[in-house]
Structure formats: structure tokens, C-alpha cells
Amino acid sequence: KDENYFLYVGNMEKRKGVDILIKAYRRYREEGGTRPLILAGKMQEDDIEQLLETALTEVEGLTYLGYVSHTTRYDLYNNCSCFVFPSMAEGFGMPILEVMKHNKPILASNLKIFDEVVGDCVERFSLAGDDDDKVISLVNGMKNIDKKINSGLVDENAYRHALDKYTPERLGGMVRDFINSQMNNR
């Protein structure tokens, strides 16, 4: 199901790129974009909270839900048009895998870890340059998603392949093998 909105779920902090996303969404709307943006997650930083409070009063189509339950998060993933993940620093990127289970388009930053996790099966935007450059790159990504949204943007086979690499059993085996290798290197 597609209820026609961009979605971000995660901690509300700069390292997750939330400031870039809020600024990019403002610009996206100023440039004629119409798709709403829903933000969900625990507020972590005062400056993000202030930026968001201002944007909520000035930018049409922006909604902040705060922290949401697992059930609500599942529904949000299931009903979004596109998941936006603008992270500046990420250990793994579990939300991307969660969204892939719903076969939804994803627009993510071009962090190296995402190359390893999902390869090239998601849309990417550049983190190069200063904040203005990042905002422009993300706005362009959002506009490209708007153009492609109904044209089979998701490669379900590529998603399935990415998800198969990270089953709980496989991840558990990787952790076990790592711990064993560390124990053997003593």
C-alpha cells in the first residue's frame, strides 16, 4: 500500500542527518514538491528540536510523530512511498533492511557501509561538500524518487538477495566466528 509520503524513522540527531533532511524537505517544498514527509523517532538533540519546531510551523506537509511503537513503525514502513535515510554515520544500517522487507523504495546517503549492506539496489544521494551541497543532493534525490515512484523502482530480487545476507542465523554465525577468531588469536 502507498499512502504517498516520504518517511524517516530513527533517532532525531545530526549524525543521522535529520538536520539535512529537514532543510532538504523545506527546499523540496519550495521547489514545488508535494509529497508529505513523516518523521518518527526519539528526539536526541536540542538544536534538532528547535530546527524541527520552526519547520513544523513554516513547511507544509511535515509531520513529527515522536517515538513510535514497533507496530506503528511497521505500519509506517508498509504505507510509505519511500524511506529516506540520510545518515552521516552508521554502524550498519538496520532500518534499511527493515524497510526492504516491505519492498519500498529507499533513498539513502552514500555511506560506504551501505555499499556493503545493500549494494546499488537503493537510490543514493551524496554526502560530499558542505551542508548546502548535501541538501541540494538530497532534494534532487527526492525529486528523482517523485518521478520514478510508479515505475517499478524496487528490484525485489536485489532486495531479497540483500536480506538473505543478513538473516538472524547468518548474523549469529558471523558473530560466533568473529569471537572464536579473537579467542584463537590470544
Positions of predicted regions on the chain:
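Conserved donor-binding/catalytic core segment of Leloir-type glycosyltransferases
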Residues: 1-16, 22-25
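Glycosyltransferase donor-sugar binding loop
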Residues: 9, 34-50, 66-67
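Short alpha-helical donor nucleotide-sugar binding micro-motif in glycosyltransferases
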Residues: 75-80
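Aromatic "clamp/platform" in nucleotide-sugar-dependent glycosyltransferases that forms part
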Residues: 88
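A charged, aromatic-enriched C-terminal amphipathic alpha-helix characteristic of glycosyltransferases
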Residues: 149-182
